Every structure is written in C-alpha cells, then in structure tokens.
Amino acid sequence: MLRQWQELAEQVREHQFRYYVRDAPVITDAEFDELLRRLEALEEQYPELRTPDSPTQLVGGAGFATEFEPVEHLERMLSLDNAFNTEELTAWAGRIHADVGDSAAYLCELKIDGVALSLVYEGGRLTRASTRGDGRTGEDVTLNARTIEDVPERLSHSEDHRMPEVLEVRGEVFFRVADFQALNASLVEEGKAPFANPRNSAAGSLRQKDPAVTARRRLRMICHGLGHTEGFRPATLHQAYLALQAWGLPVSQHTTLVADLAEVQARIDYWGEHRHEVDHEIDGVVVKVDDVALQRRLGSTSRAPRWAIAYKYPPEEAQTKLLDIRVNVGRTGRVTPFAFMTPVKVAGSTVAQATLHNASEVKRKGVLIGDTVVIRKAGDVIPEVLGPVVDLRDGSEREFVMPTTCPECGTPLAPEKEGDADIRCPNTRSCPGQLRERVFHVSSRNALDIEMLGYEAGAALLSARVIGDEGDLFGLTEEELLRTDLFRTKAGDLSANGRRLLANLDKAKAAPLWRVLVALSIRHVGPTAARALATEFGSIDAIVAATTEQLAAVEGVGPTIASAVSEWFTVDWHREIVERWRAAGVRMADERDDSVPRTLAGVTVVVTGSLPGFSRDEAKEAIVTRGGKAAGSVSKKTSYVVAGDAPGSKYDKAVELGVPILDEDGFRKLLEQGPPAEAGEPT
C-alpha cells in the first residue's frame, strides 16, 4: 500500500511541476483530478500515509522555488475545488445547504484563464504584489505588477467607502484575446517562438526579470476576492466588490448575484453558450457563497475554501492527423508514449503533441499511427487525444507497438510491480534519458537554479562525455567545456555562455542545504521536506547519520519521506554523487550565526498591525533568525500573536482560539528570553 501511495504522490507532484513551473502540462484537468482523488481516497483509508508534504495537503504550486524573492501572504491564498458536471455542482451545493441551510445567496463570476495575483495596499498605497505560490508564500512581482494598466499605485478616495488601513486583494492577471494575438504576431516577426496560449503568456510576462518587458505586453487584471484586511469588514462579497470598484480597483462587469442553485445553473448555461463573446478567455464559472459570515462558518480545507467552487466547461475539440507515436524516458525511468500531430488550433492555441500515458491507454483509445484523431483541450488548457475518426481510415494506418527495451539505453523494460500500467527502465544510474532529466533537474528553479544549464546544455555535456553524470557538474573546467560546440566560439575560445555557466556553477556551490537536497533527486523530497530536514539537522552528514524514526519525527517529513531519504543514502553511487560534489566545493552544511541566541526554536509567531519599533520584514527576520517560524495566519498551532496598532482579523482569531497575545514590549522580551512570555493587550 505504501508503494501505491508513493507512486500516486509522485505522479501528482510531477504533473503539478509541469503545470506550475514549466507551464507545459501533459494530462487533462479531469485526469489530474482523478489522480488527486485516488490519492485522497487512499489517505482516507490509511491515514498514516497522509503527511504535511502530501499533494493532498498543499496548494497546487507548493514547493516549487523560483528566481523571485519569496514573500509571505498576510492571509492564505488558496486554490479552488472543481466541478465538471451538474452532479458535482449539486453535491457541493448540498453540502452548503447541510451546513448553513437555505440562507446562502451565490455570486457567479467568470473563471478567467490567467494567473493569480495578490495585491497589498497599506494606507491606500500599493506596497506589494505576489503570485499564489504554495498559498502561504508566493513570489514578489511588485515591480512587474506596477506596469499593469489596471493596477493603481494608490487607491482612490470614496465618500461611501472608507479606505482601509491594510487591504490584501486577490485577482487574475490575463491577456485579452486581441492583445495575445498581437503579442504572438510580434514575437513571430522577431523570429521568436509564439506562446502556446494566453495563460502561458500571462504567466511568462508577469515573471519577466525586466519590468520593461512586462510593461510592453498589455497585461490586464480583474479582482475577485479578499485576503487580510484592517479597517474593512464587508458583510457580503458583492458589497466588497462595490468598494473595490470605488477605490479604483478593476472588478468584472459580468458578476451576478443569484438566490439559488437553479439560477446558478442558468448563469453557467448562459456563459457556456456566450463564452466567446467576452474579450478574454474563460474556462468556467466560479460560484461563491456571498455572505462573508457564512464563508467563515463553512471554512476551508488545507487547499481550497468550502464556500466556493469552479464549474469547468467541457473543452473544445478539433481534428488533426496523428503523424507518429514516440516514447519518452522520464527522470524516474517511466516510459511514456506521446502523440505527434499536425499542428492544429484548439481553444485559441496551437497543439502539436499530447501524452498518451501508457500502452494500455493507447489500446483503449484505439488510435493508429496515421489516423485522423479528435483532440480537445481539457479545461481549455491541456491537450488530449480522444480517439480516432474511424470512417476516415484508408488502410495505410499502422498499430503502435510499445518497445520492450529502453529506447535510450536498450535495457529491458518492465513494470515496477505486477499489474502496473506504466513500464520503467530500471537502469537508473546510466540510462542516457534519465541522466539528461536528472542533470536538468539539478539546474531547475526548485533545485540549485543554475542558469545556462538547461536541457540542451545538459544533453550536450553528456553526449560529448564532458560529464558522466550529475556528479561531475561542479568539477567542470574551461578546458572541458571547450570540448562541446555549444560553449566554443568559431575562434575556438570559450563562449560568453560557457563563462556564465562556470560562474553560475561556482555560485551554486554556496546554495543552502535544502536546495542541495532537492537537487539530489531523492524521491518525494521537494523544497518543503528539504527545508524541514535542513533546518532540523543542518548538514548532509547529520541527515545520513539520523535513523528513519528521527527523520520521520521532523515536522513536514513523516514516515514515507523519511524512508525514501534513508533508502537513497544506502545506494553506493548516490553517496558517490554527494562526495564528488563535496570534493568540488559544494556546501553540505548550513552556516548558523551562533551570535544570535535561538530563543524561539519551535515557536510559531504571527504579527498583526503596525509596530513602531519594527517594520513587518524586520519583525519576521527577528523571529526567523532566533529559530522561530513567522507565520502568516493564526491557528491552534500558533504560539503567540504580536498585536500592534490597528490589528486586523488575526487578532480576533487569536482571541477566539485562546492564543497568547503580546504587545511590542512583550515581543521584545520574547525575542530576548524566549517563552514563556507574558501576554498583554496591544498598546
């Protein structure tokens, strides 16, 4: 059962990575949801498998580090649960009725196919903009967000709505269809590859290193929710939207307040027929309980509010020619067939390939190479081959045969265990396909984030035998790089990219321990678990010396990840990788500043309101450097809440849960002496 859980969790994490980091998903929304539901059902049956690091407990983008500075949301920024049919929508409404009766009215909003963004206004001035990230911590994209036409630097004065001291507002960044088409046309004229769809282009444009590039791309934004507020407590969401509009923030003109489920369904049906009349892409309708007090009663899971749901429309379809089926070997050895097709427009973007998952799925769909096939964009995002148009066959089609040996190394393929639909290459150490994927993983943003070591560069280094595996990366020299055409000029000198690669590799040697742990490709160890292990043990050697039980006892790790870590370090060539990196100068231990006493080890502190003696960042830094956790929301696990001037809803939550509340003097004593600290009302 543990192995089944591990496989499911690994698949979910892989698809989350492809969606949130690469912007290149390979399965449909429905297929992903089915994987997640299977994982949830397994954890319900065997609760001991559920760990804080499980995909079922995290918001979709959790654990994928980026090149932008991390910033903590004032209040959690959650995802939405989905409904794909009337039955699922009715079941959700039934749960609402069971909890709060017939009193709930609903807001129906268009589900914009874009990128979530959180804005923070303090005293009416924009102070921060961040992406969703893992729901607690996102990327700071303030400079880029300021270039968006719809995002005001300062809120407008309103006679009817008092401006709040602090306003955290959530919304969606997107492209209008016409602007997206113009952007792609300009990219083609410049000889660059066009974006696949508006969502990908919005994500890429918002995360540009140069804000001037973002400014040229005509991004738009619509606000659709609130986070933390101080001095603003609307009774209903539609009243909140009126206030946002009065302050100059963009809100949708297509939002409708309705009384019951029948009216909800009517709005869903209407927009299903008129979706292309909107100037931006939509992939559904979001339904929310309007009453804020009822929202609080309904609460949320670890990843989504119970008072809202996204109804997803059936995807659009098109026909095209299936030119070939080829297989790809992934980082873990999984062999996946892919359909290569004549490029065709579906739901506003061009599709040329799609995953077929495994041989059983190819057989189930009944597709042959040479078929005319029906494809769709599930959730209007992910391409999927539905099946063949049998009537158009002319006899030239041929059956796809899954290889019995690895196309990369020739090793016989086999399922990991009897009954598995997936087959794998067991040659984990030296299979060229797996090697390329592992080298690429070392350089990825959620690992060591090494620029100039992309997929092409890694493949070139391996094919030229400059490196044998990822263990050789940090010992690379200028002479060795000159053996590859990719890093050699026509004059025979090292190229600028080659020099940058060597500099970036040298810089990566000083990366924090958690990034090194992620880069080692230990199964199940993402940034969340890696950070927990690095914080607890401080060095690779201490982690290796720890027992499985000691590893499992770390918050955020648990037995599954602990077993994977222990097993990984028992393999000889795994340990060789570590030692080669160590010998090349990669730091295998975090440096701790012993001059600052760790008075807050194991203590979780939430700060609300303004403190005269600390900025928000200074207060957080003071907590973290003393070994504590600076959290963004109050829960039963919160040790203390520090309340300054004009505290917000976090103060109320602390009172409700009985969490000790400190003023600034109490906070200073806590920093100096550690707990127990004397609680006191804010001054």
UniProtKB/Swiss-Prot annotation:
Q: Which GO terms describe its biological process?
A: DNA repair; DNA replication
The reply to whether Ligase figures as a keyword in the UniProt entry is: yes
Q: Cite the binding residues for NAD(+).
A: 29-33, 79-80, 109, 132, 172, 288, 312
Q: Domain of life here?
A: Bacteria
Q: Where does Zn(2+) bind?
A: 406, 409, 425, 431
Cited Pfam families: BRCT, DNA_ligase_aden, DNA_ligase_OB, DNA_ligase_ZBD, HHH_2, Nlig-Ia
Q: Name one GO cellular component term.
A: cytosol
The active site consists of 111 (n6-amp-lysine intermediate)
Q: Which protein family is it in? A: Belongs to the NAD-dependent DNA ligase family. LigA subfamily.
Checking NCBIfam families in the record gives:
dnlj, PRK07956.1
- Name by which UniProt lists this protein: DNA ligase
Annotated gene: ligA
